Every structure is written in structure tokens, then in C-alpha cells.
Amino acid sequence: MKVLAPLILAGAASAHTIFSSLEVGGVNQGIGQGVRVPSYNGPIEDVTSNSIACNGPPNPTTPTNKVITVRAGETVTAVWRYMLSTTGSAPNDIMDSSHKGPTMAYLKKVDNATTDSGVGGGWFKIQEDGLTNGVWGTERVINGQGRHNIKIPECIAPGQYLLRAEMLALHGASNYPGAQFYMECAQLNIVGGTGSKTPSTVSFPGAYKGTDPGVKINIYWPPVTSYQIPGPGVFTC
């Protein structure tokens, strides 16, 4: 395995992905509609960069004026594709299978979802899927037609939010920088929330460090049997 790992990395060097659209109530809102999609599908590797919040340089993102209405308590689906122009949903249309790691999702309450950059505090994690029985969260998305299901907590306050959906690829993470962070932000108007619970929050950048065991890790050798997902715990009602 020590010999094969560099070959795996070389073959997967250009295999990237984009959170291209959001599905709500079984209806896909459209590519780039309410989601700030980039013109390039590459990763962010510097966890101290402002681009770790909602993507950005070196991957310029396109503004969108749409704010998607979502009801608290429902499950939305972040749809991932290799490129914005990718129309299929086979595993190779999502992300290279070598890109193993967790999936995560965060929310941030904002005054205006179309203008807030996402940089700074206010983020709380609402979903994570790491390593379970030898299968990674990214593998479940890749083999599930690019569908990343995210439940919106019913107990949060109504209002406008940014939804940050993320896939983390660890095939090159034995050194830092090396882990590949893929994320985009959707612009939401969440209705029907009770506001009965206030989440603890973290900042982007700031939530991850290059020394975190879930960021700097060799997933090939010795074989990984457990994995610590980076960032805070998942907020629950």
C-alpha cells in the first residue's frame, strides 16, 4: 500500500467537485440558483484562508440574487457534480473515487444571505458523516448520485442563513497542506423554526487547524479504522 498510494494520488490529482445546486422538497432549484458556484472546481487547502468559508480565490465564485425558502425540520439535498456542465449522476460524474473523507454541513444566521461573505463567526455544524464500517462519507455521496442530505434543525430561529455544504478529500492529507476542502454556500430563508435553542458557533477561518487529526492524516498506512471529523460537534435540538 505504501507503494500504491503515490500512484493513486497522481491519477486523482485533477479530480475535483462542486456543490452545484440545492434540492428542496424534491425540486432541484437549478445550477447556481441560490448557490454561489465557482468557475473552477478545485479545492481550498489553506484552512487559514477566507476562502475556507464559502470558497473563493483561487476559485472565483458567481453571485446569485436568489434566496431559497426552506422549512425548519425538513431535509434538503446538496447536489454535487464534477463540473457545472456535468449532466450525469454516475460515480465518475460526482468526484473521483480516490477522494475519501467526511461530508459536513454548517449554517450561519445572517442579515442578508445575498451579501454576507460568510467569513467570520456564527457558523454551527448541522451534519457530518465520517468513516463507518470502512466506508467514507464522500463514498456515500459519490455512490448516491451526488446527493448529500442535510436536515435543517427545527429549533433554530427563522430568518436568512448561509448553508455551507462540504466534502473533504484526504488522499493527499499525510502532510499539510494536502487535505482538499470542497465547499460552496447556499442562500436560505428558513421559515417555521421555533427559535427555542441557540447553537454555539465557530468561525471560518478558525474552525479547522492544519494540525487537526482529521486534517493531517495518512489514510493509506497504517489502515484507518477510526477517524475524528474536524470542526465542532453537530448541533442538535
UniProtKB/Swiss-Prot annotation:
Biotechnology: Lignocellulose is the most abundant polymeric composite on Earth and is a recalcitrant but promising renewable substrate for industrial biotechnology applications. Together with cellobiose dehydrogenases (CDHs) an enzymatic system capable of oxidative cellulose cleavage is formed, which increases the efficiency of cellulases and put LPMOs at focus of biofuel research.
Subcellular location: Secreted
Binding site for Cu(2+): 16, 99, 182
Glycosylated residues in this chain: 112
Annotated residues for binding of O2: 171, 180
EC number from the UniProt entry: 1.14.99.56
Activity regulation, free text: Is able to utilize various natural phenolic compounds as reducing agents. Most of these reducing agents are present in plants, either free or as lignin building blocks, such as sinapic acid, or as flavonoids such as catechin and dopamine. Phenolic compounds with 1,2-benzenediol and 1,2,3-benzenetriol moieties yield the highest release of oxidized and non-oxidized glucooligosaccharides from cellulose compared to monophenols or sulfur-containing compounds.
GO molecular function: metal ion binding; monooxygenase activity
Cysteine disulfide links: 54-185, 155-237
GO biological process: cellulose catabolic process
Record key words, sorted: Carbohydrate metabolism, Cellulose degradation, Copper, Disulfide bond, Glycoprotein, Metal-binding, Monooxygenase, Oxidoreductase, Polysaccharide degradation, Secreted, Signal
Domain of life: Eukaryota
Keyword Nucleus: no
InterPro entries on file: AA9, AA9_LPMO
Cofactor binding annotation: Binds 1 copper ion per subunit.
GO cellular component: extracellular region
Cofactor: Cu(2+)
Catalytic activity: [(1->4)-beta-D-glucosyl]n+m + reduced acceptor + O2 = 4-dehydro-beta-D-glucosyl-[(1->4)-beta-D-glucosyl]n-1 + [(1->4)-beta-D-glucosyl]m + acceptor + H2O
Entry annotated with the keyword Cell wall biogenesis/degradation: no
Family the UniProt entry places it in: Belongs to the polysaccharide monooxygenase AA9 family.
Function, in words: Lytic polysaccharide monooxygenase (LPMO) that depolymerizes crystalline and amorphous polysaccharides via the oxidation of scissile alpha- or beta-(1-4)-glycosidic bonds, yielding C4 oxidation products. Catalysis by LPMOs requires the reduction of the active-site copper from Cu(II) to Cu(I) by a reducing agent and H(2)O(2) or O(2) as a cosubstrate. Shows oxidative cleavage of beta-(1-3, 1-4)-glucan from oat spelt or xyloglucan from tamarind seed, in addition to cellulose.
Protein name: AA9 family lytic polysaccharide monooxygenase C
Native source organism of the sequence: Thermothelomyces thermophilus (strain ATCC 42464 / BCRC 31852 / DSM 1799)
Annotated gene: LPMO9C
